[in-house]
From Swiss-Prot:
Cofactor descriptive note: Binds 2 magnesium ions per tetramer.
Designated gene of the protein: pheS
NCBIfam families, alphabetized: pheS
Protein name per UniProt: Phenylalanine--tRNA ligase alpha subunit
Source organism of this protein record: Actinobacillus pleuropneumoniae serotype 3 (strain JL03)
Catalytic reaction list: tRNA(Phe) + L-phenylalanine + ATP = L-phenylalanyl-tRNA(Phe) + AMP + diphosphate + H(+)
EC number: 6.1.1.20
Gene3D superfamilies (alphabetical): Bira Bifunctional Protein, Domain 2 (3.30.930.10)
Principal cellular location given in the protein's record: cytoplasm
InterPro entries named in the record: aa-tRNA-synth_II (IPR006195), aa-tRNA-synth_II/BPL/LPL (IPR045864), Phe-tRNA-synth_IIc_asu (IPR004529), Phe-tRNA_ligase_II_N (IPR004188), Phe_tRNA_ligase_alpha1_bac (IPR022911), Phenylalanyl-tRNA_Synthase (IPR002319), tRNA-bd_arm (IPR010978)
Domain of life: Bacteria
Keyword Aminoacyl-tRNA synthetase set for record: yes
Length: 328
């Protein structure tokens, strides 16, 4: 016990004699409390003490040890605070300087267009639908009245995995899956990625389409025309001159392509549409004598290019921030 008292007084004196310096405090801690420190050695000597005396002596050693540690930690905390205060005092901070500008992200222009289109049709009661991007030839071609000899099946247009599976070339397969699982009336808008083996200024191997499908007992071409007029006026935010040109799509009859008159006096195609072909309705178990429907298909990148006067479709996928930041 006498040795414990002497060790405690020695430790107190050593702490009091320390000049300011965190390194010196660490050396003191190692000397007294490290693996080979004085207090550690004292605890190890307890094995030489009679068993009945060990608890009392051990408690006194721990009490003395804790006292020194409290002084050590208090001194360390005070010195760390002094060092921090000195560092802050030495730093010059001009609080009048403007803060760092927060960089704000923004939606991709293609995403902006998809949101605008979906919002317009959702407000008219259309439900958003989706389907797989890896499709079977049945949903991508057969069910849509596209026969085996149709050019769209050729290798130069379609990415095939095998004789039955492919990357979908259109979102029309969503229409088939929806009609198989729902009874009329049906109103859906189906945005999604599609794939075709083409790459130039106006084509990319992956692009986005949005398709509409409306099936009911009295769906007609007049409704279709009115819907498209209202949509184009809302999307381009101007009262555009619109024309419908007769066209051919295997899955609609009659079919039309829709053009808008631009400021340069030229007509530009924006989408395709038509009344759902009776064969397509039969393929999904809907009686074409009782129900009719119309469908609309539009390329998202095409609409985006027209709205923002972009000349090269590939710009949307090059991740050039100088280009993308214009659409925030």
């Amino acid at each position: 016990m006498q040795h414990l008292k002497e060790l405690t007084e020695k430790a107190r004196s050593a702490l009091d004699a320390l000049d300011q310096g965190l390194d010196a405090l660490e050396e003191f801690r190692v000397e007294y409390f490290g693996k080979k420190g004085h207090f550690t050695a004292l605890m190890q000597e307890l094995r030489n003490v009679a068993a009945e005396e060990r608890p009392a002596i051990g408690a006194k050693i721990n009490e003395a040890k804790q006292t020194i540690l409290d002084i050590l930690n208090a001194k360390k905390e005070a010195w760390e605070q002094e060092a921090l205060n000195a560092k802050l005092a030495a730093e010059s901070i001009d609080v009048s300087l403007p803060g760092r500008k927060t960089e704000l992200g923004g939606l991709h222009p293609v995403s902006i267009t998809i949101e605008r289109v979906v919002k317009f049709f959702s407000e008219l009661g259309f439900t958003v639908a989706s389907g797989p991007e890896i499709e079977t030839d049945y949903y991508n071609f057969d069910a849509l009245n596209i026969p085996a000899h149709h050019p769209a099946r050729a290798d130069h247009d379609t990415f095939w995995f095998d004789a039955q599976r492919l990357l979908r070339t259109q979102t029309s397969g969503v229409q088939i899956r929806t009609m198989e699982n729902m009874q009329p009336p049906i109103r859906i808008v189906a945005p999604g990625r599609v794939y075709r083996n083409d790459y130039d200024q106006t084509h990319t191997p992956m692009f986005h389409q949005i398709e509409l499908l409306y099936v009911d007992k009295k769906a007609n071409f007049t409704e279709l025309k009115g819907l498209i007029h209202d949509f184009l006026k809302a999307f381009f935010e101007e009262d555009l001159q619109v024309r419908f040109r007769p066209s051919f799509f295997p899955f609609t009859e009659p079919s039309a392509e829709v053009d808008v008159m631009r400021q340069n006096g030229k007509w530009l195609e924006v989408l395709g549409c038509g009344m759902v072909h009776p064969n397509v309705l039969r393929n999904v178990g809907i009686d074409p004598e009782e129900y009719s429907g119309f469908a609309v298909g539009m390329g998202v990148e095409r609409l985006t290019m027209l709205r923002y006067n972009v000349t090269d479709l590939r710009s949307f996928f090059e991740n050039d921030l100088r280009f993308l930041k214009q659409f925030k």
